[in-house]
From Swiss-Prot:
Its EC number is 3.6.5.-. The gene is obg. It comes from Burkholderia vietnamiensis (strain G4 / LMG 22486). This is GTPase Obg. Mg(2+) binds at S173, T193. Keywords: Cytoplasm, GTP-binding, Hydrolase, Magnesium, Metal-binding, Nucleotide-binding.
Amino acid sequence: MKFIDEARIEVIAGDGGDGSASMRREKFVPFGGPDGGDGGRGGNVYAIADRNINTLIDYRYAKKHMARNGENGRGSDCYGKGGDDITLRMPVGTVVTDMDTGELIADLTEHDQQVMLAKGGSGGLGNLHFKSSTNRAPRQKTDGKPGERRMLRLELKVLADVGLLGMPNAGKSTFISSVSNAKPKIADYPFTTLAPNLGVVRVGPSKSFVIADIPGLIEGAAEGAGLGHQFLRHLQRTGVLLHLVDLAPFDESVDPVAEAKAIVGELRKYDEALYEKPRWLVLNKLDMVPEDERDARVADFLERFGWDGPVFQISALTGQGCEALCYAIYDYLAEHSDAHRAAEEEDLAADVRFRDAPPSDGGATSGGDA
């Protein structure tokens, strides 16, 4: 299935039904009084996170989603039926934003998390409500309220603990396939990876973390070169970034230091917060460097790159150094996960508007069709 991580949709909640202006008509009851019922409420539109969905492709083509209107009230004190709700199933990690106001409506981070996107209109009042001691036969009634109508932007950000950065052919796909259960396409040409890949790395019976591989970046990605830099959004939820560098490029004219600096520059252009995220340097393809030259080549790279953070030397192809790197990642995540989660929850509490859950009897369900 094609990977789609962005879509724009319109959601329209149902209108409330109109109240009824009716009088009781019954044999031997000459002055029956008002008996007009209220209109039914309009249906709501909900989003629910589903871990079995991993793309927004349904919403790329089905752009309008409408809940049903409430029915009008009738005589004999009959209330109109409420409109059926609809539920839109979306991947875990979807962010929903109102395109007109910029309001963050929902951040779906957990399976089965449910959020109201548009509220149905309330039903109108029947003339039964307007009866008084001075007005025994009221003709007044009210119309139902219109439901909310919104243009929404859906943006999928994959949920991972670790993100991989690097130029095309830096060995990111080889690394993730070496340390996890992911099976990405691997080939000796650039841009083999066209969509994010997720893999689970296990360092013990109950110890694991999720790693995300995104398509490679090149210099000028911010201006649309290569595949652009839009896939960087999938690294925004990670706890640490691994910057993979090809220390032994096939083309001897390619300077690994210049390529590494270009990646950092593109990262900063895209998002300052992502640039400030903890980042580790991973020097890959050591198996391609003669053993007696490794120390000198690594030292030269670090000096010219000006790096003073964590450094790991690996060969993703042979597995050399990968186990130590994975254990270091797990220890770091275990130490920092509580603080990272608390900060994320604090941000969401300030921005995300959660609404009431739908009634227990529920309504219609949609997987992307209106």
